[in-house]
Swiss-Prot record:
One of its GO terms (cellular component) is nucleosome. It comes from the Eukaryota. This is Histone H2B.1. Belongs to the histone H2B family. Its main location: nucleus. GO terms for molecular function: DNA binding; protein heterodimerization activity; structural constituent of chromatin.
Length: 132
């Protein structure tokens, strides 16, 4: 007979529960306050554009939240499409060309034309400012 057959399974005793440490308000140090996590939004940029186009018009917090969600959604769609285009062409970098093509694919007709022209203008302006 083997030695394994004669051995009985070890019985496990339940682990002893230790009393939980009580947390008191005096143990919290006043100098160690928890910092609020920053949430990045497009609110300040949306507000600046609003004031450029309609200086005397305001915007509610709910409307700002909706516009912020809209900008995040469009950004995500364009980035996703540009990523697919880069993968199709076996490139690891998303360039201005992929972004431009993604905009043409996602936005309809005239809106795509205006977006491409504004994007081209912004890239040209940025390029000229970095060279100077």
């Amino acid at each position: 007979m083997s030695s394994k057959a004669s051995k009985a399974p070890a019985s496990k005793a339940p682990a002893e529960k230790k009393p939980a440490a009580k947390k008191t308000s005096s143990s919290v140090d006043a100098s160690k306050k928890r910092t609020k996590t920053r949430k990045e939004t497009y609110s300040s940029y949306i507000y600046k554009v609003l004031k450029q186009t309609h200086p005397d018009t305001g915007i509610s917090q709910k409307s700002m939240s909706i516009l912020n969600s809209f900008v995040n959604d469009i950004f995500e769609r364009i980035a996703s499409e540009a990523s697919k285009l880069a993968a199709y062409n076996k490139k690891s970098t998303i360039s201005a060309r992929e972004i431009q093509t993604a905009v043409r694919l996602i936005l309809p007709g005239e809106l795509a034309k205006h977006a491409v022209s504004e994007g081209t203008r912004a890239v040209t302006k940025y390029s000229s400012s970095t060279q100077a």
